[in-house]
Amino acid sequence: MKITIHIWDLPHRLFHWLLAASVTASYITAKIGGALIDWHGRLGLFILGLLVFRIVWGFIGSTHSRFVTFFPTFSRLVAYLKGRWQGIGHNPLGGLSVIALLATLAVQVGTGLFANDDIAFEGPLFDFVDKSFSDQLTGWHNTVFDFLLALVVLHLVAIIFYRGVKKTNLVVPMLTGKKKIPIALAEAVATDHDKGFGPLRLILSLIISSTVVWGVSGGISQLYPVQSQQQIAQAAPSSF
């Protein structure tokens, strides 16, 4: 017999679907290029905000949104592979996937902040590095995306596998926030599924993520104007 519990809070679910949509849109705008490259940059900043929010929410959000509940420690991975793991949220392999995706996205967004396309686009932090380093980071930005794409495909394959083989729908709970689990499992694990969720914590997370986006998108430069590395190089006296 099963019961329905609330497992994923609304901020977590909104983050998940907004991230999926924005990464998809970012990929499309990058491939099309041209006038859409500016939108690619805006989407990158939006994804940065989502990532910062998720990191903060991973510490102060509700129970199953917190990293401590699903971080793939060695003991958890061993228990899962031996069939002894009991839990409601992300299983250890799922937790490993989440950490890998977040880390890869962080590198992808971080390199994009300094990137350029040698035509008209420059990342918001382009002026803080010299052109050669920006070119190097641009190369990493392009390379890391291939790894990110592989992780996304693996994520989708896992969803299909769970639906087809294990008869477990992972999509519906991420839409509704609710999940059906055996009563015995509900009694064996923590039941405080919404612990920590509250408007003040949500507001704090939004303030932190918004502040970071504001800072890297020009806020820091407005408060503390700096001369770009390119301008410094041009102003340096020539040696004969």
Predicted regions and their residues:
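Membrane-embedded alpha-helical bundles that constitute the cytochrome b-like, heme-associated redox core
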Residues: 1-240
